[in-house]
């Protein structure tokens, strides 16, 4: 079983792509410092959410599509400057 350390690792990579852009898919999505970058990320989240719904109905690729949705959601949090700990603390608060 994998622990939440993998989320931290993915989050660090996303932060690195934001802070030291290279020619990668992730860097390109965050490249614009204006509303266009955010809109592109939000559009991807919408696409991935739809793909999760379709995968759920077809019982195909659900895990892969869910991972894509979570990845793009984390990308949005990084773009907006939200620390990963804020997300984890919110999950912890909901357990109570």
Swiss-Prot record:
- What's any GO biological process attached to this entry? L-histidine biosynthetic process
Q: What class of enzyme is it?
A: hydrolase
Provide this UniProt record's keywords sorted from A to Z: Amino-acid biosynthesis, ATP-binding, Cytoplasm, Histidine biosynthesis, Hydrolase, Nucleotide-binding
**Where does it reside?**
Cytoplasm
Q: Which InterPro entries match?
A: HisE, PRib-ATP_PPHydrolase-like
List the coiled-coil residues: none
What Enzyme Commission number(s) appear in the record?
A: 3.6.1.31
GO CC annotations on file: cytoplasm
- Could you state a single Gene Ontology molecular function term? phosphoribosyl-ATP diphosphatase activity
Q: Give the main localization category.
A: cytoplasm
Give the metabolic or biological pathway.
Answer: Amino-acid biosynthesis; L-histidine biosynthesis; L-histidine from 5-phospho-alpha-D-ribose 1-diphosphate: step 2/9
Enumerate the catalysed reactions.
Answer: 1-(5-phospho-beta-D-ribosyl)-ATP + H2O = 1-(5-phospho-beta-D-ribosyl)-5'-AMP + diphosphate + H(+)
Q: Which family does it belong to?
A: Belongs to the PRA-PH family.
Q: Which PANTHER family match?
A: HISTIDINE BIOSYNTHESIS BIFUNCTIONAL PROTEIN, HISTIDINE BIOSYNTHESIS BIFUNCTIONAL PROTEIN HIS7
The protein's name is Phosphoribosyl-ATP pyrophosphatase
Please tell me the species this chain comes from: Methanothermobacter thermautotrophicus (strain ATCC 29096 / DSM 1053 / JCM 10044 / NBRC 100330 / Delta H)
Taxonomy of origin reads: Archaea, Methanobacteriati, Methanobacteriota, Methanomada group, Methanobacteria
């Amino acid at each position: 079983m994998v622990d939440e350390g993998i989320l931290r690792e993915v989050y660090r990579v996303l932060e690195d792509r934001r802070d030291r852009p290279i020619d990668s898919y992730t860097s390109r999505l965050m490249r614009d410092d204006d509303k266009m970058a955010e809109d592109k990320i939000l559009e991807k989240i919408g696409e991935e959410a739809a793909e999760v719904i379709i995968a759920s109905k077809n019982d195909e690729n659900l895990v892969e599509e869910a991972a894509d949705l979570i990845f793009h959601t984390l990308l949005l949090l990084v773009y907006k400057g939200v620390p990963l700990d804020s997300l984890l603390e919110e999950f912890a608060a909901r357990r109570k």
